Amino acid sequence: MSLSAARSFLSEAAYGEQELDANSALMELDKGLRSCKLGEQCEAVVLFPKLFQKYPFPILINSAFLKLADIFRLGNNFLRLCVLKVTQLSEKHLEKILNVDEFVKRVFSVIHSNDPVARAITLRMLGSLASIIPERKNAHHSIRQSLDSHDNVEVEAAIFAAASFSSHSKDFAAGICNKISEMIQGLDTPVELKLKLIPMLQHMHHDASLASCSRELLQELVSSYPSTSMLIVTLHTFTQLATSSLVDIPEQICLLLQYLKEDPRKAVKRLSIQDLKLLAKKAPHLWTRKNIQVLCECALHTPYNSLKLGMLSVLSTLSGTIAIKQYFSPNAGDSSPAPHHTDLVKLAQECCYHSDLAVAAHGITVLTSIAAFCPEKEVIQLEQETVMGMESLILLCSQDDSKTAQATLKTALTSLVQMLKTCPHLSQSSVELLLRQLHCACDPARVLMCQALAAIATQQPVLVEGMLGDLLELFRVASHRTSEKQQELLVSLATVLFVASQASLSAEVKAVIRQQLENVANGWTVYQIARQASRMGCHDFSRELYQSLRTRVASEHFYFWLNSLMEFSQAEQCLSGLEDGDYSAAMSAISEALKSYQKGIASLTAASTPLSPLTFQCEFVKLRIDTLQALSQLICTCNSLKTSPPPAIATTIALSSGSDLQRCGRISTQMKFSMDEFRSLAARYADLYQSSFDADYATLRNVELQQQSCLLVSYVIEALIIDPQTASFQEFGTHGSILAESEYELRMMAVFNHVLEEVENLSRKHPPVSYLHTGCLCDTVIAILKIPLSFQRYFFQKLQSTSIKLALSPSPRTPNEPIPVQNNQQLTLKVEGVIQHGSSPGLFRKIQAVCLKVSSTLQTKPGSDFKIPLESKTNEIEQKVEPHNDYFSTQFLLNFSILGTHQVSVEASVVDTSGIEWKTGPKNTVSVKSLEDPYSQQLRHQLQQQQQNVPQPAAQRNISTRFQ
């Protein structure tokens, strides 16, 4: 019964629940540990990793590991083995054990057992704990002693423990190195044992002398033991040691290339290729032109496709790095052939048409990278040959639905998209080829080709209206085929149609898609297509799809979510018909859009749940609403120039008051207010950007574009009306159009550049303020609104999930109770935190450090008898902590010299690997009550009593007594 309760706790409890639940789960598991049945004990032990995952704070983990240590000490070998597995699975939580000495003491007691299996399990347990006890001399001694054991199980466990301690302890590695060398070179050591001892040498990299001795020993082993098994283990250990010591990588590359070229055994060649690929990933900058040349010669002359594939994979890894640049940029004085005639290019060209598809895929990858790095005079011919190789591979693989063919096709299409980024003049012919091939390709290949088409068309407007007929016919054909990839193919084809239509779907396209979706598509496919329509700006069609889906969901939260999306699409559709110069229609359209947005934000709020608060979505929509309101107000302000023009004496008033803005009349004040409002909106967009740590790059770029549009409007107001002399728009530059990666971004950039040109021309020709200036402002508003808003992926889907959970100590016994502290003492506030990830941690960015900001504010006023020193009103402390295994801990010393209740806030933000700070939260608060220390209180009371006991002076005579 107790274990079922524990399982329910661990399966149903979510992040952020109360500490009581963690203690309850631990108590239930403790009951299982104390059970008389071995099965229940084992089941309780194996549930501990889930407990650590749900409640990853040191207090609970320390208690749990102490209980596991007791089971390890008192249980049988099977229970010990279960505890060992739990420890190895929970390696990232080991540093949270507070009582390390007590934990190790209980575990280490088993090392004195007469049972060699128990000793072996203990050694493996100690090896698993090496990260927290690297310098324990008793553990070092036990490992040395067990290496001389006559029991094979114990010796293997000692080797495992020795390898673990060697990787963490410099002293242990230096001390054990000679013993390991003697055992490896000893004639009485079996070959099987030598094969297990040799990999230990890869950890002897703590200093140069130790690494040099290990390398000399490995070099001797390579010469003395040329057998295949021994040579493979020795060479791989050689590579691992070089990877850690770094300075020996060039020598190791030469050694591996030597064995690849000269050793006839395929197993040795495969191992050499495997290690060369490892070194290519680790240190591509250390590969010389000669190294790559030797590898190319080996690949050209080998008769085995498997070995050629391996060598090409190494070259493929190097092709995207600086190594290729070094290959085509020899040192001064070197006489090298033209790039087109090098062995690397010959090899890549030869492999592009190889019968083995995997070899051909790597050949295409290498050739694509060469075309990007090659000198200008050679690049044209290489570009054409590369595209021809891609096209032949696409033709070959598009009709084969095997996994190998599809993987090759994906590689070829990825290379094609990359190639067309740098060579846009080749886009049209490549797109035409893909469209022709779509008719005869299999469904899995069609999905990949449609995705490639969408990626190419997003970068370049190559899908013209004449191609829509072929795409619609493909959509009709796809709906009649029943295959596993049918639904995915419908989504991919619809995406290509949206890109080709450029946010203006014709009635025929809508009718065809709608009819086919009604016939064969399931609800999820319809939702995916609607989502793509929202991303591409086809809001009219997405509104219809969301409306049809509202009644097909089983949860009211999903209903409100779809209803909000429908309202947002309706709102954006209201803005799609704007025309230049029609300002009254623009006002009406914005008003209708705001009505739909207000309905949508109400539904969006109803769709949020505690586990899915939809924070980004709500804030993004609120900003959109406020932006539309600000744009509407700006048009009204511009129109006020007609209804309330500047008075005739405006210039005189401006000269007498010294304010140049007065020459424009009342419109200047309104424009100043609008400019400040748009700058405030830009700052809010910047805050939204900084709080979206898990967002994909396209979503962040979209938020940045919205921010830049607000800055652009504020700049136009300042440049045309407020202060033309000092106005500047540094936040935007013309270089942005070169870096644009989507059609939406290209259109926004075009509008920005056009507006900036108009403003510059107008400000030079006409002095402010005139109808030309207000007309330019209104035209800017309409130009921005005419571009359909793109709802990017993060609005619908979170691919990366990162959250931080904080724990503060001391903590109050009850939530509303303040922590008492005397005013002459300082409070030590300990802040602990864990970083929790979703299924794809670090997909877009990784956390390098956590920034903790602690501040305190006085909540209640102190008594009138106490003076408040100004410097002691608040605590403001900031500290950066680098997390280790997703855990961090630090302490703050806070001063509360002022009596009263203080509110202490701890806010966390993260710094990614690029050094950018993100305001992710959370923000925890705790109340602290500053009390007067007893000694000062006693002195104050004594002083008050003395003042009360002093006799009062005689009262003065009143006026009546004076005249008596």
UniProtKB/Swiss-Prot annotation:
Annotated spans, Disordered: 937-964
Low complexity bias spans: 937-958
Primary localization: nucleus
Keywords, in A-Z order: Chromosome, Cytoplasm, Developmental protein, DNA damage, Nucleus
Subcellular location: Nucleus; Chromosome; Cytoplasm
UniProt key word DNA damage: yes
Gene Ontology cellular component annotations, sorted alphabetically: chromosome; cytoplasm; INTAC complex; integrator complex; nucleus
GO biological process assignments: DNA damage response; lens development in camera-type eye; RNA polymerase II transcription initiation surveillance; snRNA 3'-end processing
Disruption phenotype: Fishes have a defective lens structure and abnormally shaped jaw and neurocranium.
Subunit details: Component of the Integrator complex, composed of core subunits INTS1, INTS2, INTS3, INTS4, INTS5, INTS6, INTS7, INTS8, INTS9/RC74, INTS10, INTS11/CPSF3L, INTS12, INTS13, INTS14 and INTS15. The core complex associates with protein phosphatase 2A subunits PPP2CA and PPP2R1A, to form the Integrator-PP2A (INTAC) complex.
Function: Component of the integrator complex, a multiprotein complex that terminates RNA polymerase II (Pol II) transcription in the promoter-proximal region of genes.
Family: Belongs to the Integrator subunit 7 family.
Name of this chain's protein: Integrator complex subunit 7
Originating gene: ints7
